Curated annotation (Swiss-Prot):
Pfam families: AIRS, AIRS_C. This is Selenide, water dikinase. Its EC number is 2.7.9.3. Coiled coil: none annotated. Binds 1 Mg(2+) ion per monomer. ATP binds at K20, T48, R49, D50, D68, D91, G139, H140, S141. Keywords: ATP-binding, Kinase, Magnesium, Metal-binding, Nucleotide-binding, Selenium, Transferase. The lineage of its organism: Bacteria, Pseudomonadati, Pseudomonadota, Gammaproteobacteria, Enterobacterales. Mg(2+) binds at D51, D91, D227. Its cofactor is Mg(2+). CDD domains: SelD. The active site is at C17.
Amino acid sequence: MSEQTIRLTQYSHGAGCGCKISPKVLETILHSEQAKFVDPNLLVGNETRDDAAVYDLGNGTSVISTTDFFMPIVDNPFDFGRIAATNAISDIFAMGGKPIMAIAILGWPINTLAPEIAREVIEGGRFACQQAGIALAGGHSIDAPEPIFGLAVTGIVPTERVKRNSTAQPGCKLFLTKPLGIGVLTTAEKKSLLKPEHIGLATEVMCQMNLAGAAFANIDGVKAMTDVTGFGLLGHLSEVCQGAGVQAQIVYQEIPKLPGVEEYIAQGAVPGGTQRNFASYGHLMGEMPVEWRDLLCDPQTSGGLLLAVTPESETEVKATAAEFGITLTAIGELVTARGGRPMIEIR
């Protein structure tokens, strides 16, 4: 089988960040009765489900460490590698950091798919690393029943500039740097529903590097930041709210959306991860139309940054985003938690 005709998505049961283990199941897996080793220099661990771990070196600089990998979300091997690498590197930017090095993680069905195809995947990953200004310095591979690719990435950040997902404040406005609907469009393509004018749109968005995160770190008014990936906007927003003890009010019409996404939802192009996300986070949300839920719980692969910004810093954040070709519009705001109200209200 040639590299030109291969359809990688046929060789995996999941796709991109949509193949994440559901939050409810993950909570069971991570639960431990053992006493946890406490290291005072570990600034960010997994307590708030943040994007990466952060370790204070004690000299004003902290190290950021993350890993991310998944099964193919697109058929083209080079694009798969590029998307997976971009997605992994994003975790460093989401913490406000600068990536400095990456190593590859590769699982490959060597008796089913030619090694030349795996090489194309690696080349796509290397291309993304070059875009981020880092080397793909090595890696590890195994013979696996399904193709898997991703990176372990190391970054650095001034300790005082670390951006967490748990430090938002009431009054902050919410911004999203990429449109939603990646899971919907990739599902529509698998179902042969995708219109010609929408082919390649999801890949283009997934390949956009979240470089702006390192610049947002220099703005004091950016009180919290995370990237929106497999748990969807509402899943990752709920982590922001839970970490800070606040509630969110979202205006659906202000949320950036990929072209055609609502039409494809109406045609049933909803990935399986959407329902898993709703099953995990639905109890935290107010009433909304099903079609809104299907977009807001849509698992994103290499999605955008979600920012919580003080009103005083809104102009500076928008100007910084514009330097990276990003136009920002507030999609909602955070408010003081009130009893008897859902954590996230959509209107």
